[in-house]
């Protein structure tokens, strides 16, 4: 009887050859590219007179540098315009499909690919972007890669990699009202650490994971990388199949039935052997907010910022840096901390269900005076669906700005930036020093609903209080 994990099965199916030194040459089923990490890779191909090996397995979009206030070309930033022009030229020269602005398909790469049905169970997926682990929500093994590896995949449709260990993260129970997938993954990273997953793939499993929607699973897998894991995944199940059926790139008819039969065999075997297992109880997780300069520096909304002597010795120096940079004091509450900017979007939380969750909090309320709040849909499809529901009008009536799709303030490679020492409540995935554009800007990570609550109150607020009040 087989005792393999999904990771083992997908790895074995894509193994081309074992290499000296313990690495494996692995076939890449889908290669996603964008404007930031691909130009140098294409230039390297041209220098060697090489062409793209499998253009039909390569899909491009533009996301990082896109201004979200206006998509009109040329962009006001000449560097951004040059980067997009270069991507367009490279895709044209190598016959690669580009989901460009106005195509109806453009969006953040990790939002665009799943909603189009490009991401499928059992695939190996690579992209020159840290949060490629998002696609693991479908039972794929997805890796973020560097520019030199982007070059290698373009040239050979393969990667040299060492096999990871697998840690199962088992989550019992069910998330309570006002607690979301973002809270769950911040809770996991808080307890396992930002380096706890180094050398591992994370398999997310258990009753609480089973109950999550596909978009919630994407949030979980998206941030596996923030816990040090190279990838994260969820076993495909009926929730997965229901989400995929009818998507543009999903097979139909007999091909769908055949795919479905194969996908059902991919899940980790009942007696699969894991290298490690950690258990959590979803019922004990509360709305969670980061207070420091790593995603692991997080606490429940009802907790106090930890004192340095309560932390592991290895975490104490980073905590001291965080207190100083964030201008926060150990032993104080994060609830009530004033906010300057509220950002809802990103590849972590820029999907339709994220906007719907925030909209429920915003309905019949208004952004607090002096707060800059904006919503950035993760893709053109998300924007269209949200606008069909009237969410754009709801947010704008409440004092939010409704923007065009793009990565926006997640990483500030575009005009959306913090200024000075502003504090943002952000639904993105990283709170590093200077991450959102200002060298002194401060980022608090939280769920979209918590960001909405912060926008309404003007400070970090327990979203459950607003839920209990009703709209």
UniProtKB/Swiss-Prot annotation:
Its EC number is 4.2.1.33. Gene3D superfamilies: Aconitase, domain 3 (3.30.499.10). Binds 1 [4Fe-4S] cluster per subunit. [4Fe-4S] cluster binds at residues 347, 407, 410. It comes from the Bacteria. GO terms for biological process: L-leucine biosynthetic process. One of its GO terms (molecular function) is 3-isopropylmalate dehydratase activity. The keyword Nuclease does not apply. Keywords: 4Fe-4S, Amino-acid biosynthesis, Branched-chain amino acid biosynthesis, Iron, Iron-sulfur, Leucine biosynthesis, Lyase, Metal-binding. It catalyses: (2R,3S)-3-isopropylmalate = (2S)-2-isopropylmalate. Its cofactor is [4Fe-4S] cluster. Pathway: Amino-acid biosynthesis; L-leucine biosynthesis; L-leucine from 3-methyl-2-oxobutanoate: step 2/4. Belongs to the aconitase/IPM isomerase family. LeuC type 1 subfamily. NCBIfam families: leuC (TIGR00170), PRK05478.1 (NF004016), PRK12466.1 (NF009116). HAMAP family: LeuC_type1 (MF_01026). This is 3-isopropylmalate dehydratase large subunit. It comes from Prochlorococcus marinus (strain MIT 9211).
């Amino acid at each position: 009887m087989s005792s393999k994990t999904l990771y083992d099965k997908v790895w074995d199916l894509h193994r081309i050859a074992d290499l000296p030194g313990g690495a494996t040459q692995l076939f890449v089923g889908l290669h996603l590219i964008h404007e930031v990490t691909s130009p140098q890779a294409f230039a390297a191909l041209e220098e060697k007179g090489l062409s793209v090996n499998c253009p039909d397995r390569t899909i491009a979009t533009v996301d990082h540098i896109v201004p979200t206030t206006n998509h009109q070309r040329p962009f006001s930033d000449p560097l951004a315009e040059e980067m997009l022009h270069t991507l367009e030229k490279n895709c044209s020269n190598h016959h690669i499909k580009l989901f460009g602005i106005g195509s109806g398909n453009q969006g953040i790469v990790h939002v665009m690919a799943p909603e189009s049905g490009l991401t499928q169970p059992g695939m190996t997926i690579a992209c020159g972007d840290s949060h490629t682990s998002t696609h693991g929500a479908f039972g794929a093994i997805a890796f973020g890669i560097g520019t030199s590896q982007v070059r290698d995949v373009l040239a050979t449709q393969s990667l040299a990699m060492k096999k990871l260990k697998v840690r199962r993260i088992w989550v019992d129970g069910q998330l309570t009202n006002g607690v979301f997938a973002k809270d769950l993954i911040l809770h996991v990273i808080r307890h396992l650490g930002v380096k706890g997953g180094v050398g591992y793939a994370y398999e997310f499993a258990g009753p609480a994971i089973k109950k999550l929607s596909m978009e919630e699973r994407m949030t979980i897998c998206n941030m596996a990388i923030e816990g040090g894991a190279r990838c994260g995944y969820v076993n495909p199940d009926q929730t997965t199949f229901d989400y995929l059926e009818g998507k543009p790139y999903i097979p139909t008819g007999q091909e769908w039935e055949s795919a479905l039969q194969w996908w059902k065999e991919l899940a980790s075997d009942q007696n699969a052997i894991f290298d490690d297992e950690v258990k959590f109880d979803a019922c004990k997780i509360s709305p969670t907010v980061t207070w420091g300069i790593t995603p692991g520096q997080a606490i429940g909304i009802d907790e106090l910022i930890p004192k340095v002597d309560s932390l592991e010795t290895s975490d104490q120096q980073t905590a001291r840096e965080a207190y100083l940079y964030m201008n926060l004091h150990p032993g104080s509450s994060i609830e009530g901390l004033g906010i300057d900017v509220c950002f809802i979007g990103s590849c972590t939380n820029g999907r339709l269900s994220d906007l719907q969750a925030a909209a429920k909090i915003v309905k019949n309320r208004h952004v607090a005076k002096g707060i800059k709040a904006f919503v950035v849909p993760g893709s053109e499809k998300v924007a269209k669906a949200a606008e069909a529901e009237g969410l754009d009008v709801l947010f704008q009536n409440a004092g939010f700005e409704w923007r065009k799709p793009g990565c926006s303030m997640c990483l500030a490679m575009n005009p959306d930036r913090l200024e000075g020492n502003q504090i943002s409540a952000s639904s993105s995935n990283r709170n590093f020093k200077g991450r959102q554009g200002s060298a002194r800007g401060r980022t608090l990570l939280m769920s979209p609903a918590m960001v909405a609550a912060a926008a309404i109150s003007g400070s970090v607020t327990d979203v459950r209080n607003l839920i209990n009040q009703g709209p």
